[in-house]
Structures are given as structure tokens and as C-alpha cells.
Amino acid sequence: MAQSILIVDDERDIVSMLNQYFCKIGYVVYTAINGKEALNAITKHPDIILLDINMPDMNGFTICEKIRNFVSCPIIFLTARIEDCDKIKGFAVGGDDYVVKPFSVDELEARVAAHLRREKRHGSSAIV
């Protein structure tokens, strides 16, 4: 069964590009362009989440805090924020990785694959 990825970003170009890329290499892709959609998409039980921080209705830190209470899958922040304090906060609220825009899609794919391999070794990413 194909692994699934949830992409949460208010920049539609990024969502579209990542959607096409990950679909092409065999992932089932779910997308959300704001916090409300992201919270609804969690019910699809993605294996991994790519999460922007800067969004108009709810920032990625808040989304991560809210979903971390019932989702154990890896969360990779994908953001333009480069400050160490933002990276530290991202990990503090439950993020597993932090990738700064602009990013290499190949590197992002490698990080996604590494996190999913780790999850497979340590158990499922089921909702707890």
C-alpha cells in the first residue's frame, strides 16, 4: 500500500508542485491550504505531514500543537523562517524536522523517506 503525505501550505504553487512530485513517485497526497483544512485532513491518517508555519488563519506551530495530541506521524516544518528561535520552537511543539524554503525537492524527498523508514522500524504512525 502506498504511503501518504499531507502537505499544508497557503502557497498554492508550492502545494501544487509538491503534490505533483510526490504523486509521481508513488505517494498518496492530501493537501490543505490553511489550518482548518489541515485539521480536517488529519482524519485521513497521513503517514507524514509537511507543514508550513506562516499561514493566515492558524500558524503551523499552533496546528502542530493541536494535532500532536492525537497524531504520532512525523511532522516536517517547511518554512521560510530561518531564525534559530523558530527552529527551536518547531521542535518544542512537536515537529520532527525543519526544512527552510527555498528547498531542494530531492533533499525533501530524502528526508521524508528517512522519517518514514524510521517510523516503519519503530511502529506505525497511527492515531493514538
Where are these regions (language model features)?
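Two-component/phosphorelay signaling modules centered on CheY-like receiver
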Residues: 12-30
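Acidic catalytic/metal-coordinating carboxylates
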Residues: 33-34, 59-62, 86
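Conserved phosphotransfer cores of two-component systems
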Residues: 42-46, 66-73, 93
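Acidic, metal-coordinating helix/loop segments flanking the phosphotransfer/catalytic sites
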Residues: 31-48
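Short, Lys/Arg-enriched segments at the junction into DNA-binding effector domains
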Residues: 3-4, 114-128
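Receiver (REC) domain active-site loop signature in two-component systems and cognate sites
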Residues: 55
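Active-site residues of response regulator receiver
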Residues: 9, 52, 79
